[in-house]
Amino acid sequence: MTEAARNIAARETTVRISEIFGPTIQGEGPLIGLPTVFVRTGGCDYRCSWCDTLHAVDSEYRDTWKPMSVEAIWQEVLGLSGGMPLTVSLSGGNPAIQPLGTLIAKGQGEGYRFALETQGSIAKDWFADLDHLVLSPKPPSSGMETDWQAFEDCLAAAGDGPQVALKVVIFDDADYAYAKAASARFPHLPVYLQPGNHTPPPPDDDDARVDIDGVMDRMLWLVEKISEDRWFSARVLPQLHVLLWGNKRGV
């Protein structure tokens, strides 16, 4: 696509946006600690029981999701980053619902990198253009069922383009067993285990209390589990932003 065509697409393509914020650090997964601007889209095809971003998921909050052109989104990213290239995290909800290919192309043309996390339920051809793709299938505690064919479709769509990682949120033994099975199914993917936050915020209260002690107890349990099982390829990482700021939004 020529630069002129990209500019036209940027003006004409509309994305539902829940919030854009940063720069801050990526709080979880393989890019943890990396300076990042977040573009959070609105809408999701899942309803996980412990979702911590219901304001970007529940259709009750649809009126707060702002339809924005790619050009308008990009101007916000540029303003937040001061025009200095960094990583842009595309999140949600499920960002795979939205038409993000034009945004990725525009940003990469200016030296920015793009990462996306999704549950792996919807494959898009523009996955191949990402720099990082984190596939985070939802374990039994979420109340959702995993469509492994759709997950494999996401891997196929990504091809050899982005660095791909597997991340699973863990609350209990059933989730742990699910993560081990998923890792065995896709042994070529680096795997990250994240202790679940059992005190996620209500969508209208980002100051809700977090049981940090409970989350850290779960993390210690996870460390002990992988050590006992000799699962030495797994990495256990917390949600760093939760440890720093609790359930506060926009950080």
Curated annotation (Swiss-Prot):
Gene Ontology terms: biological process = queuosine biosynthetic process
The biological pathway it contributes to is:
Purine metabolism; 7-cyano-7-deazaguanine biosynthesis
Required cofactor(s): [4Fe-4S] cluster; S-adenosyl-L-methionine; Mg(2+)
Q: What is the catalytic activity of this protein?
A: 6-carboxy-5,6,7,8-tetrahydropterin + H(+) = 7-carboxy-7-deazaguanine + NH4(+)
* EC nos: 4.3.99.3
Q: Which GO terms describe its molecular function?
A: 4 iron, 4 sulfur cluster binding; carbon-nitrogen lyase activity; magnesium ion binding; S-adenosyl-L-methionine binding
- Record-linked InterPro entries: 7-CO-7-deazaguanine_synth-like, Aldolase_TIM, Deazaguanine_synth, rSAM
Residue numbers binding substrate? I25, Q26, G27, R40, S91
Positions of the Radical SAM core domain: 31-247
Q: How does the cofactor attach, per the note?
A: Binds 1 [4Fe-4S] cluster. The cluster is coordinated with 3 cysteines and an exchangeable S-adenosyl-L-methionine.
* Binding residue positions for Mg(2+): T53
Family in the record: Belongs to the radical SAM superfamily. 7-carboxy-7-deazaguanine synthase family.
Record HAMAP family: QueE
PANTHER family per the UniProt record, alphabetical: 7-CARBOXY-7-DEAZAGUANINE SYNTHASE
Function recorded in the entry: Catalyzes the complex heterocyclic radical-mediated conversion of 6-carboxy-5,6,7,8-tetrahydropterin (CPH4) to 7-carboxy-7-deazaguanine (CDG), a step common to the biosynthetic pathways of all 7-deazapurine-containing compounds.
Q: Which protein is depicted?
A: 7-carboxy-7-deazaguanine synthase
What species is this protein from? Answer: Agrobacterium fabrum (strain C58 / ATCC 33970) (Agrobacterium tumefaciens (strain C58))
